[in-house]
Curated annotation (Swiss-Prot):
Late in virus-infected cells, may be cleaved from a 56-kDa protein to a 53-kDa protein by a cellular caspase. This cleavage might be a marker for the onset of apoptosis in infected cells or have a specific function in virus host interaction. Encapsidates the negative strand viral RNA, protecting it from nucleases. The encapsidated genomic RNA is termed the ribonucleoprotein (RNP) and serves as template for transcription and replication. The RNP needs to be localized in the host nucleus to start an infectious cycle, but is too large to diffuse through the nuclear pore complex. NP comprises at least 2 nuclear localization signals that are responsible for the active RNP import into the nucleus through cellular importin alpha/beta pathway. The gene is NP. GO terms for biological process: symbiont entry into host cell; viral penetration into host nucleus. The keyword rRNA processing does not apply. One of its GO terms (cellular component) is host cell nucleus. A motif (Bipartite nuclear localization signal) lies at residues 198-216. InterPro entries: Flu_NP. GO terms for molecular function: RNA binding; structural molecule activity. It comes from the Viruses. This is Nucleoprotein.
Length: 498
């Protein structure tokens, strides 16, 4: 079974290491974020950024994107072989914002990729530090998850916009490795597989020859990753069918869409990590904090602590609400785009609003936007409590598959019961249980029908005071369960465009 070995702590996935004990994991994750921090400080020096400019999240994102681009080998090779007008394949850059005479000005910078790689390696003890790069990719992915909706992408692959809570990590690049795979939602994996199958249907040679053999290996690997996310035997058996298909086609697409729907109730395991912008790690390193010595975890109190003492700024457009901008970034920092708003609100200590009610656009500023009217404000990224991040999908008990929480993919391991109208979801499953997977489909539908909405998931798990770093006194919040707390309801956000 290919999913064996996937149950190691995901900090290990982050650091690519062999099995390590908790202390070693904390040290290697600490080394990773410390390296990001050192790199950021060095870049600020190179660019002569003031302290304030270095804390601007837009500058942080530009610097992060530059290093990701500098190490994107596939794209670099492609750019060298297909030179396009006005693009130097050896250079990378982006907008840097500086404060001049009381105004923000945009300056486009260009750097040799080689130079960026040198600075990155120097900050990471001479290593390529792929784990740190993946960490930045996951931060960007979490930011996209909180900012954009993927309705169009869902519809294009024949899925339903109601499945948006399954789309975590849908903008992660392919090269994000094992750590990237753990944070991808069921819908994201299904979408990647459907795209692959569609190419195979349209292009006769897709599965043929030497290239086809590699394609096939990638296909089976993706199937195994998805299979490892499901927690019931019937869902896994269906994945085996999809993986072993001689010539994947429409039948497999049907099966995958069925499985994605089933994941709305029989939730998959999807990891959540608090990945922060590079400038936050930079600030901590600059103040003398030694991440490797102190140790660090992406799923415990550490990111909350770090955000309690970091001041980060953001550019604000004329009609945007700074509090809403803060909420967006807070959600991205904790990978909470698909969490129940009531849980997020309780932890954050201020109301977290659904996205349709936010007066803010994305964090990044387009090159054609007018800088004259730009202001900046402090992002409020502090929290009232902290909670452990989950990777289970929030099923009430792992022995028998039970109801996960509809339209959310829990981020925090905090007790809640699951308000959902089973009828709405079951309506998606009318009819089609024939075909070669009929027995599995019947079994999955039976499990979904038996899922009890009143079950409590994460029983006894609670949030913790920020002074309680050993997580000794769980506070179990009680929620008003009358309304479903999905961030995506009444949505009017922009679509994600590459």
């Amino acid at each position: 079974m290919a999913s064996q070995g996937t149950k190691r702590p995901y900090e290990q996935m982050e650091t690519g290491g062999e099995r390590q004990n908790a202390t070693e994991i904390r040290a290697s994750v600490g080394r990773m974020v410390g390296g990001i921090g050192r790199f950021y400080i060095q870049m600020c020096t190179e660019l002569k950024l003031s302290d304030y400019e270095g804390r601007l999240i837009q500058n942080s994102i530009t610097i992060e994107r530059m290093v990701l681009s500098a190490f994107d080998e596939r794209r670099n090779k492609y750019l060298e072989e297909h030179p396009s007008a006005g693009k130097d394949p050896k250079k990378t850059g982006g907008p840097i914002y500086r404060r001049r005479d009381g105004k923000w000005v945009r300056e486009l910078i260009l750097y040799d990729k080689e130079e960026i790689r040198r600075i990155w390696r120097q900050a990471n003890n001479g290593e390529d530090a792929t784990a740190g790069l993946t960490h930045l990719m996951i931060w960007h992915s979490n930011l996209n998850d909180a900012t954009y909706q993927r309705t169009r992408a869902l519809v294009r692959t024949g899925m339903d916009p109601r499945m948006c809570s399954l789309m975590q990590g849908s903008t992660l690049p392919r090269r994000s490795g094992a750590a990237g795979a753990t944070v991808k939602g069921v819908g994201t994996m299904v979408m990647e597989l459907i795209r692959m199958i569609k190419r195979g249907i349209n292009d006769r040679n897709f599965w043929r020859g030497e290239n086809g053999r590699r394609t096939r290996i990638a296909y089976e690997r993706m199937c195994n990753i998805l299979k490892g996310k499901f927690q019931t035997a019937a869902q896994r058996a269906m994945m085996d069918q999809v993986r072993e298909s001689r010539n994947p086609g429409n039948a497999e697409i049907e099966d995958l869409i069925f499985l994605a729907r089933s994941a709305l109730i029989l939730r998959g395991s999807v990891a959540h990590k608090s990945c922060l912008p590079a400038c936050v790690y930079g600030l901590a390193v600059a103040s003398g904090y030694d991440f490797e010595r102190e140790g660090y975890s992406l799923v415990g109190i550490d990111p909350f602590r770090l955000l309690q003492n970091s001041q980060v700024f953001s550019l604000i457009r004329p009609n945007e609400n700074p509090a809403h901008k803060s909420q967006l970034v807070w959600m991205a920092c904790h990978s909470a785009a698909f969490e129940d708003l009531r849980v997020s609100s309780f932890i954050r200590g201020t109301r977290v609003a659904p996205r349709g009610q936010l007066s803010t656009r994305g964090v990044q500023i387009a090159s054609n936007e007018n800088m004259e009217t730009m202001d900046s404000s402090t992002l409020e990224l502090r929290s009232r409590y902290w909670a452990i991040r989950t990777r289970s999908g929030g099923n009430t008990n792992q022995q028998r598959a039970s109801a996960g929480q509809i339209s959310v993919q829990p981020t925090f391991s905090v007790q809640r019961n699951l308000p959902f109208e089973r009828a709405t979801i079951m309506a998606a499953f009318t009819g089609n249980t024939e075909g070669r997977t009929s027995d599995m489909r019947t079994e999955i539908i039976r499990m979904m029908e038996n899922a009890r909405p009143e079950d409590v998931s994460f029983q006894g798990r609670g949030v913790f005071e920020l002074s309680d770093e050993k997580a000794t006194n769980p506070i179990v919040p009680s929620f008003d369960m009358s309304n479903e707390g999905s961030y995506f309801f009444g949505d009017n956000a922009e679509e994600y465009e590459n």
